[in-house]
């Protein structure tokens, strides 16, 4: 399944200014991800996993080296180009869901489709399909404050998946969920990965997530410490 | 843009009370500004109409020495009516009036007045001059209600007037008040007493002479006549324009304060929004917006307050403004003491231009005020915004 390379990271370094000095979060990372992978960047806080995820998500740029996502070099993308990449090809799932609080479930999931200028009928069909994947078709009118944490994260997954992106980037998606909800969410993501061939890239240090990953990249102090591929 | 409007609308409606508080404050500004501007337009319109109806008609010829602000010129401000105007006078299209300086003695008191000779059959002015066409033991006279109050004179009262004729001789006679009129133009009422023109000419030995010749219809241009100067209505109402202009400047300060309060609320909301909604901003960027587009969204959101305010204003303001236009606004002060033509009740006049320009100005100012704090988004780091870590 994981044959075509869709993310290619070469000698990637990312530094942040800290007062008069610099803090290097990523130190010459080399990684490649293929289509349909279910992989995770694993490591403690400060290991650089979120930084790497943000660069892959074109929310940040490398200080040096290169990150190519779906053939686009992140460092040389314009703001418009990066926005287009995120809009068309990438889906995001965040630790704290980041749902639009004043919009209901339907509107939250519909949002990426609005940006892609689908017609109202197309949007409705696609939103209902995405909500069906996550089992929330009965909550279309509910607003995020009326939902449980697990339901919010399922809405976030539906929002990330509704446009059928090539890559979904999930940053600590289960950090705010209990064990039962975490497993439920992860099973949904595994199912979508298998059915839609979407590449999932996680940033996590949660054991529950790690157990579901088919590929685990352990980061330590900005370096790749281990790159494990499960055989099952 | 369509999407920004759609999202901004959802966000505003979703924000609930915060949105509606801003909208109500802003709508209050809309209604008050339109109402006050309407009052000024109505006042201007009413003052000019009243002046035309009571004082200036469609324009005037003034005897060249006449200066309404200098009573000492009155003794020299008369001349024979030009022959070329006789036909118009006969047809009633021009009304001559003679003004002389005099003194009135009500209840033994002495007061200066301008004695105005007016044809009792004139129909250009709204003055009830027909009340001068009566046979009485004394000369019939009409006065305004303010003069009546000040001089303590009522219909049927006799009073002595004194004047100086062309030979410099003082003379006096009695007049009887045959009519009291109510008029919004102070210069027609205060300090003036109207008697029949021919009687005044007789008293002054000024047969066939006049001080002012007033036209019925608006005259775009009149030929030059030696010894007379032509004044069109624009010149004659210039003082109204100047006073309205002065009042408008004063009111503009009030509008500015009103707008400032409303804008302060919008600005505050925008600043708070940008601080509180960092994660949302980050999410918009993660989902495919550029930072510029998010700035646009927040600007549209802020500006949309003014659109909602215009709608809310229409809901409660329209009935109020229509009611005011019908029932008018009664002045809290004695209008006759204001110094210019002013009715006790002013009727606001709202033109489409007035409403549209007010709406456009408020929308424009709101947009600028909304954009100002939103520019901060353009400098935000989306990864930090996503975590709500910006200070």
List PLM regions with ranges.
Chain B
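Hydrophobic alpha-helical transmembrane segments of multi-pass inner-membrane transport and secretion
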Residues: 16-41, 245-282, 303-316, 361-368
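Alpha-helical transmembrane segments
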Residues: 31-61, 321-328
């Amino acid at each position: 399944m994981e044959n075509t390379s869709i993310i290619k990271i070469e000698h990637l370094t990312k530094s942040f200014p800290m007062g008069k000095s610099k803090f290097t979060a990523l130190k010459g990372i080399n990684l490649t991800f293929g289509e349909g992978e279910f992989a995770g960047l694993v490591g403690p806080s400060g290991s650089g996993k979120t930084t790497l995820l943000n660069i892959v998500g074109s929310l940040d740029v490398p200080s040096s080296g290169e990150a190519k996502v779906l053939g686009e070099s992140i460092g040389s993308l314009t703001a418009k180009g990066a926005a287009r990449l995120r809009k068309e090809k990438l889906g995001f799932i965040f630790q704290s869901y980041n749902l639009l609080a004043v919009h209901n479930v339907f509107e939250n999931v519909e949002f990426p489709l609005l940006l892609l200028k689908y017609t109202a009928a197309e949007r409705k069909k696609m939103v209902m399909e995405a909500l069906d994947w996550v089992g929330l078709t009965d909550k279309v009118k509910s607003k995020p404050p009326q939902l449980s944490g697990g339901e919010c994260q399922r809405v976030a997954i539906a929002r990330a998946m509704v446009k059928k992106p090539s890559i979904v980037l999930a940053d600590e998606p289960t950090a705010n969920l209990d064990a039962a909800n975490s497993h439920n969410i992860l099973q949904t993501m595994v199912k979508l990965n298998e059915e839609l061939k979407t590449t999932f890239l996680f940033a996590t240090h949660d054991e529950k997530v790690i157990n579901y990953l088919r590929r685990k990249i352990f980061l330590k102090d900005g370096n790749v410490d281990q790159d494990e591929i499960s055989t099952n | 843009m369509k999407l920004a409007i759609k999202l901004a609308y959802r966000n505003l409606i979703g924000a609930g009370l915060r949105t509606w508080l801003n909208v109500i404050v802003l709508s209050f500004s809309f209604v008050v500004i339109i109402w006050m501007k309407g009052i000024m337009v109505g006042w201007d319109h009413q003052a000019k109409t009243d002046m035309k109806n009571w004082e200036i008609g469609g324009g005037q010829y003034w005897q060249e020495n006449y200066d309404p602000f200098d009573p000492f010129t009155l003794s020299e401000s008369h001349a024979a009516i030009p022959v070329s105007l006789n036909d118009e006078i006969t047809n009633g299209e021009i009304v001559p009036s003679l003004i002389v300086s005099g003194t009135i003695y009500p209840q033994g008191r002495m007061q200066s007045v301008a004695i105005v000779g007016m044809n009792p059959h004139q129909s250009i002015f709204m003055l009830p001059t027909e009340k001068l066409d009566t046979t009485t033991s004394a000369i019939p006279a009409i006065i305004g209600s303010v003069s009546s109050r000040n001089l303590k004179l009522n219909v049927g009262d006799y009073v002595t007037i004194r004047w100086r004729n062309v030979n410099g001789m003082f003379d006096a006679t009695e007049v009887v008040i045959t009519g009291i009129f109510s008029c919004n133009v102070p210069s027609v009422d205060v300090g003036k007493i109207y008697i029949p023109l021919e009687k005044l000419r007789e008293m002054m030995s000024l047969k066939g002479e006049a001080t002012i010749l007033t036209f019925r219809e608006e005259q775009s241009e009149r030929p030059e006549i030696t010894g007379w100067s032509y004044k069109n209505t624009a010149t004659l109402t210039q003082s109204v324009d100047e006073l309205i202009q002065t009042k408008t400047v004063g009111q503009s300060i009030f509008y500015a304060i009103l707008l400032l309060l409303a804008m302060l609320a919008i600005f505050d909301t925008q600043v708070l929004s940008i601080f509180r909604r960092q994660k949302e901003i980050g999410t918009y960027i993660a989902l495919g917006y550029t930072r510029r587009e998010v700035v646009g969204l927040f600007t549209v959101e802020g500006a949309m307050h003014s659109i909602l305010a215009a709608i809310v204003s229409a809901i409660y303001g329209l009935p109020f403004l229509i009611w005011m236009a019908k029932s008018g606004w009664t002045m809290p002060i004695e209008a006759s003491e204001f110094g210019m033509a002013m009715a006790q009740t002013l009727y606001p006049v709202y033109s489409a231009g007035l409403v549209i320009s007010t709406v456009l100005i408020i929308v424009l100012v709101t947009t600028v005020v909304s954009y100002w704090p939103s520019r901060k988004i353009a400098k935000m780091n989306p990864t930090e915004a996503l975590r709500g870590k910006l200070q």
